[in-house]
Amino acid sequence: MFAIIGIVVVFGAIVGGYLMEKGNLHVLLQPAELIIIAGAAAGTVLISNPPHILKKMAQGLAGVFGGTKFPRQRYLDSLKLLFDLFSRSRREGLSAIEADVEDPTKSKTFTAFPAIMKDHHVLNFICDTLRTATSGAVEPFDIDQMMELDMEVHHQEAAQPVAALSTVADSLPGLGIVAAVLGVVITMGALGGPPEEIGHKVAAALVGTFLGILLCYGLLGPIASNMAKSADEENAYYHVLRVAMNAFIKGTAPILAVEIGRRAVPGPVRPGFQELERLCRKKGPEAAAA
């Protein structure tokens, strides 16, 4: 939502200021210049990126306008899920949660949290870690290294579409100059004609440079920055899961393990101690509805 507001503010301020100076909007409407810039930019994306990165880029663009994936409630649900798993494991032994982590779709503990069930990356991260812990043959330090490696790979993958979009954004001013140069070539061919016609062609050429710079610094650049921050938010979320699971695997009590996880939650969405404690005292499905 804020991204949409920001785009409206950017274009509103530019167009508004232009009109205040008695500018003619019709001069800025140059479809040919836009086709040159947008088409060349799309081509560079296709040249430089494999299909799976293009897919992630599209998903990232949709995420910019769809809001955060990790609000306060997502952290509460995740910590409650971990607490339920930790508590049952502490009471009945690690083997008690083996069936849950082997097939979470049949686990009442997991299915009580639909948002987590929809995120297969998070589901695999939790289940793979706890499945390794239930084997009993791996040291806590080694499990923590596995989680760190998993997070590193996932974060690198999340950074790829951001880098791709940033590269496109950086190329737009240059592509705008390409469009402007082509406009100048056309203008040179019209020399000797009416001054009004020459002036119109010069204006059209300058619009190419204008569009390239505007789309770079006013649209795609900020969108790429937003996607990068979303990737950082996701990494912070995985860090919360990691420290909570690592604490429990080392032998920490369930409530203290999720408290360690809570301390790792970023400040703007961090739940309070008492809020998390009350939630953990509730039963699984009841807590999920709270």
Please tell me what each predicted stretch does:
Residues M20-P161, E233-A290:
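Large intracellular
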